[in-house]
Amino acid sequence: MILNKIVHPLIESFIRNISGGLGQRIRYQYYKRRFKSCGVNVKIDEGVIFQTPENMDIGSNVWFLPFSIISARPSYTDLNNKLIYKKNNTSFDINIGSIRIGNEVSIGAYNIIQGMGGIVINDKVTTSARVSIYSFSHYPFDKNDSTKVTYANSMVKSKDVSCIESPIVLMEGVWLGLNVTVLGGTVGKNSFVATNSVLIDDLEENSYATGNPAKKIKDRFK
């Protein structure tokens, strides 16, 4: 407990912003011992933050570009007053709240990858700058009783807070364009989601998708 609350944060705040190849090597040597599992040739640029890395499996040849935040669910998460709508994803095959990243993956700069509901990123996936992936977020009403007044921030303790838990899977070869937001579902193999799109549901294999909500407009590859 002391390690998680005091020692680890101190070490991470010190090594986080060391620039260049030296910083990458230091962060790799540190985090490969903190991840649940970790491959080789993992590059972690300056400013990257990992929250609950012990619930993350990281493959080989993975590059985390600067100033991204990757967070899994901590074991002590307080969900007591949360009304959680759980959205099923049949492609999701790891524990809720965990993150698994495959091989040959590039995570763009200023990404937010929030794995409270669970995220699987398969091999050869690319996320461009400022991509946001939220597998657990607040919801505008209670799915079981839409007449009930609910709230949308975790500081509310005396009333109900409505949430949605939506595990996310990015299949092999997926590319998310600049500023894409993913809020749920499975993105099919070799699909591309265009800049500024918002994805809230499944996307079939080999899709070229755009819009809010994002829809397939054509095949990516002929």
Language model features with spans:
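Short helix N-cap motif at coil->helix boundaries in the Bergerat
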Residues: 201, 218
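Flexible, glycine/small-residue-enriched loop-and-beta-strand segment within the central core
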Residues: 51-58, 63-187, 212, 220-221
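A generic "structured core" feature
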Residues: 175, 181-182, 188, 192-199, ...
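Conserved active-site beta-strand element of glycosyltransferases/polysaccharide synthases
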Residues: 209
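Extended, small-residue-rich solenoid/repeat segments and analogous flexible loops
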Residues: 1-51
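A short, acidic, flexible beta-alpha connecting loop/helix-capping segment that sits on the rim
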Residues: 197, 213-215
